[in-house]
Amino acid sequence: ADAMVVDVEQSLREHRLEEIYYRTDHHWTVLGAYYGYRAWAESMGFVPREKEEFAAETVSRNFLGTVQAKVGVGAEPDRMERWIPVDGTEWEAYYDRAEEPAGLYAESALESRDKYRFYLDGNHGLTEIRRVKAGGNGAGENGAGENSARENGAETSGRKLCIIRDSYANSFAPFAACHYDSVFLVDLRYFNGDLETFLEQEGITDILALYRIPGFAVENSVWKMGKRG
């Protein structure tokens, strides 16, 4: 299978004067994740969704992240957002093979110290995002107005994405889900299954490894990518 490295750095540099990273945390913001998504989508041959296709909602103005916790000096809290598709597309999430669906956003996290857990309920070994309602703007798999891709209210791209990831994928995955029937997120730190078997059983068509480089360089679980049997 073909493999490629997506040049996200160039896209982020072009928007370096915008709030693409939190001041008090090591993660990118939803805006930063969006620009990363655009670079990835273009590399995949998808037409990226435009910012205007989402409604940005501020969910917290009191986010103090990991950098603040380590440094311990006073800092202005960060603002957290979620972006909702204006076309009405809806998803549900299943965490660690749970039988009952949950939302993509953990509202209770906003009242806790770990507010970043708001995005996809934090770190799970396995997360599945399923589309339950397709949008009504006529955009097909590539967001290019392909009405023929709509069937019975669902977008039938026939493709499944697996993101092998760290927590940087938590705010990225909802954007990627615009182009797939299902998106799986595998965190190798907590995933104890056989990865190759999982990919085959779920019929995964596309794989993305998404990591923050400093974390990936010292991550001791990536050997599982090459594990067989």
Where are these regions (language model features)?
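Extracellular glycan-modifying ectodomains
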Residues: 1-229
